[in-house]
Amino acid sequence: MANPRNFDGVTVLITGASMGVGAATAAAFGERGARLVLIARGQEKLEILARKLNLGDRVMVTPMDVTDTDALTQVLHETRNRFGSVDVLVNNAGFHARGSAESVSAEDIGRMIDVNLKAPLMATRLALPYLRQSKRPAVINVASLAGRTPVPGSATYSATKFGLRAFGLALAEELRGEGIKIASVSPGPIDTGFIMEDIDSVTDLTFSQPISTAEQVAEAIVSLVDNQVRDLPMPRMSGYLTTISYLFPALGRSLRPMLERKGRRTKDRLKRERGKG
């Protein structure tokens, strides 16, 4: 097995790379010697990150929308031409329009499906021919605890993350014996702008679970490239809870009011600490 601390000569593509988990993942792979292809819509933020990483010609900045299949095709071709290989794909880009299923606009529903589900499926499909030529191939999907247990107020988002996990688990079986690692990490709340900047609209249930940092999720992503884990919830205790809720849905529903009260207290505390409450 390859040294999990050494990614010299390994090319890693990261979507949603400009901030949060994506930026932390870029730093984690970069400090281990990887060559990076940073993908996001905002060119300025990508260039700021590239300068901060200070990896010289080991970084390729690629501003694009992950839902653009032609652009995905082109970036894979350019990556191989520049770095000689495509080794690891991290499907991290995400979009979340919060609210009841009835209140979320049709446009936002479509955007969640396109960004959270269709884009990583297409990126993975397009990357597979390149990954088959790699000595250390892997696809790591960033899912969510909302893809392990349904979250009211995030119905479409939950559906996309359930779908992404299912795709990864099924694809891992399809590719059994080919040596391509397919895995998903399913974090709960993460201390990033993705939820913290709009804390009032985030469900109380979400904040019932321990909050991870972007760096913790990034380290989990790096570890998934080489270990035997296919489906990693974060933190593990939350994974146990979501499994219990899945196996015993009546029990899960009975626990929900208690968890929502706990989450409400956490939200109130966070708002006070950030001067928003």
Positions of PLM-derived features:
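The beta1-alpha1 cofactor-binding region of Rossmann-like NAD(H)/NADP(H)-dependent oxidoreductases
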Residues: E44, P63-Q74, A106
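Substrate-binding pocket helix/loop in short-chain dehydrogenase/reductase
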Residues: S100-A101, S105-I113
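Active-site helix of classical SDR
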Residues: T124, T160
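Residue(s) in the substrate-gating loop at a strand-loop-helix junction
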Residues: S144
